[in-house]
């Protein structure tokens, strides 16, 4: 099936806001596209009465509303809930829906923490850093090492550190990495932690911290040189040259969009 779909029903006057991606949708086609492309984000924050009411009131699809509401009352699986939405406009071929349903089943049979991590990792990949951090935090608040094993939570902390670092919150990133290292003594995690210290601490305090940790001089020098190299590289990046060709108004607007997307605001 192609990537373009003819708009078959009316456009909503009032959009439906999808919190996980901070976006408004106006048509059932847009809803279908979201469901198909973001299966890791489909949960009760989307599959609820509010969505059903929007489909009835804004799109005028009363029969579909009734069908979906019945699915909610029976507490059907996510796969069973979204099937009528796709069928309403024939958005997917039979094989496409079968493949999608298989993916959803594989997600649904996973423990809650793994499903949450899949969602958080997806948000991290698509630069929704604040929402990713929120999901990682929920996992850590309710953690039960007996269920998932300590390595799972070390991985959660590592990924959470990545989200913080993307927001330039290097102290928070360092804290996550130190917690992760306390769970699993990974050399890579330790090096990432030291990198964050070089970035977020004043030089004198960083030297003190390295002495406390008994970091070998050779490793300290290597890390400091690497961070300096990255800093210089960033300043001299090709992007700086590209930006010089773009009007300042466009640069500011682009940076605004990137910021709002990453903070989900």
PLM feature spans:
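Long, contiguous interaction/recruitment modules in multidomain scaffold/adaptor proteins
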Residues: 1-112
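Extended amphipathic alpha-helical coiled-coil/heptad-repeat regions
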Residues: 99-265
């Amino acid at each position: 099936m192609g990537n373009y779909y003819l708009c078959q029903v009316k456009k909503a006057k009032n959009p439906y806001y999808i919190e996980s991606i901070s976006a408004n949708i106006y048509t059932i086609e847009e809803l279908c596209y979201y469901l198909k492309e973001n299966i890791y984000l489909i949960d009760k924050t989307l599959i609820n009465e509010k969505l059903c009411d929007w489909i009835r009131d804004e799109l005028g699809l009363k029969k579909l509303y009734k069908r979906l509401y019945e699915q909610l009352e029976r507490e059907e699986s996510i796969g069973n809930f979204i099937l009528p939405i796709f069928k309403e406009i024939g958005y997917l071929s039979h094989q496409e829906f079968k493949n999608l349903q298989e993916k959803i089943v594989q997600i649904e049979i996973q423990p809650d923490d793994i499903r949450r991590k899949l969602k958080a990792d997806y948000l991290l990949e698509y630069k929704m850093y604040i929402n990713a951090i929120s999901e990682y935090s929920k996992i850590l608040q309710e953690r039960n090492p007996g269920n998932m094993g300590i390595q799972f939570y070390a991985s959660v902390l590592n990924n959470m550190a990545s989200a913080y670092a993307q927001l330039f919150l290097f102290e928070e990133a360092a804290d996550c990495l130190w917690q992760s290292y306390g769970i699993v003594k990974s050399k890579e995690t330790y090096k990432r932690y030291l990198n964050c210290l070089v970035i977020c601490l004043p030089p004198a305090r960083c030297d003190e911290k390295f002495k406390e940790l008994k970091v070998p001089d050779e490793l300290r020098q290597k890390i400091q040189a690497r961070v300096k190299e990255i800093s210089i590289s960033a300043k001299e990046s090709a992007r700086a040259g590209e930006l010089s060709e773009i009007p300042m108004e466009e640069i500011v607007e682009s940076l605004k969009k990137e910021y709002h997307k990453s903070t989900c605001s």
